Amino acid sequence: MAIPWVEKYRPKTFEEIVNQEEAKYTLASWICAKFKAPREFCTRWAKKKDKEIVEAKAVLLAGPPGIGKTTIVHALAREIKYELIELNASDVRTGERIKQVVGRGLREASLFGYEGKLVLFDEVDGLHVKEDLGGLETIVEIIEIAKVPVIMTANNPYDPKFRPLRDIALVINLKRLSEDDVVEVLRRICANEGAKCEEEALRSIAKSSLGDLRAAINDLQMYLSSGKKILTVDDIKRVGERNPQLSMFEILDRVYRARWFDEARAISFNPSFDWEQYFLWALETIPTVYKDLELMAIAYDRLSKADMFLGRIKKTQEWELLPYALELSLGGISQVKNKPRLPPFIKYGFPQRLLLLAKSKEARRRREALVEYLAQNLHVSKSFVKSELIYVLSAIAKKDHSIIDRLSKALGINALDIKNLLL
């Protein structure tokens, strides 16, 4: 069986990692400031002395899939001769299990002359706080007491539930690789495999990978399977290109960084694009991207016009208006006049409206159940209960609280639920 090329051509040293210089300098500076590391390595890579770097208890590598987050940790461990204790947080989820695996790894003696140990929690954003009992808390505990380097990786560490990790870790953002970066790696692999690959074919693979080098290498291996030694653009067209799934953070980033109107508009064709969710996110991220008040006003004006189209669609079901709403909310907010040069990384916040809805989900569920119960027992419609009855009962209850107990006894409903509904 052929070795997967993503493993065969995985970078072994810092030098081999493509176009992540800033991340490499920051990570090396943290390691060299706090732990034992070879002098040659520190001289070459430890370029920073920031207080934030020196005081950080751990490192959290952030960025989209396939850009080298795990690879950079493997290369680091090899460079400084540390034994790597690797845990995928998506697989080992409970606090007890994490303690067992990490504890065993730290207790066991290192073989082969390692200088120390390094703990890697891969894909920590795969933890779901409620389901994965104690997983997040255990990782925080380990970081607080560990005398060895602890590094984590995540595609999206900015979910509010991961705040405890961000508070104690140095967040290092790895950037998405450019099309040229990916093509250069693919070209080198083709040469090593003795394959003749058309430049246009490699560019097609790189373009559809959206900076995910792992995906691009996997695609190249697929196209050159069965000993095939020639790759043309016709081969790509015949098999078909990758249509990647994008997170909302990635969708927003592509919209704001689009170079022209059609590039931003085309994002709506991605299978993971949800226009209702996107609208909520766009509403709150405009001030994050455009600091200038004039640019902010232009973007919000276009988004408000898109909202008018969406309101009309919901009211009249005229779905032929949706393209106009998408053009305004995608290309409209992306292509503003005198658009500034955007920084390499933008921290997009989770929409507060969605957070509030999540927090009030149980209260809304109980309210809806109570409305339905009242409608059935009083032989009226739910809309009548919501639009009229609740307001009448609420007005009475504010003057006479005893009505809550009387309603509770008459209808067999918890008095606290009635109170929450009316007051």
UniProtKB/Swiss-Prot annotation:
Binding residues for ATP: G63, P64, P65, G66, I67, G68, K69, T70
GO annotation (BP), single: DNA replication
InterPro entries assigned to the protein according to its UniProt record, in alphabetical order: AAA+_ATPase, ATPase_AAA_core, P-loop_NTPase, Rep_factor-C_lsu, RFC_lid
GO MF annotation list: ATP binding; ATP hydrolysis activity; DNA clamp loader activity
Gene3D superfamilies per UniProt: 1.10.8.60, P-loop containing nucleotide triphosphate hydrolases (3.40.50.300)
Keywords: ATP-binding, DNA replication, Nucleotide-binding
SMART domains for the chain: AAA (SM00382)
Pfam families, alphabetized: AAA, RCF1-5-like_lid
Keyword ATP-binding in annotation: yes
Quaternary structure, from the entry: Heteromultimer composed of small subunits (RfcS) and large subunits (RfcL).
Entry's family note: Belongs to the activator 1 small subunits family. RfcL subfamily.
Described purpose of this protein according to its UniProt entry: Part of the RFC clamp loader complex which loads the PCNA sliding clamp onto DNA.
Family matches, as NCBIfam families: PRK04195.1-5 (NF003229)
Stated name of the protein: Replication factor C large subunit
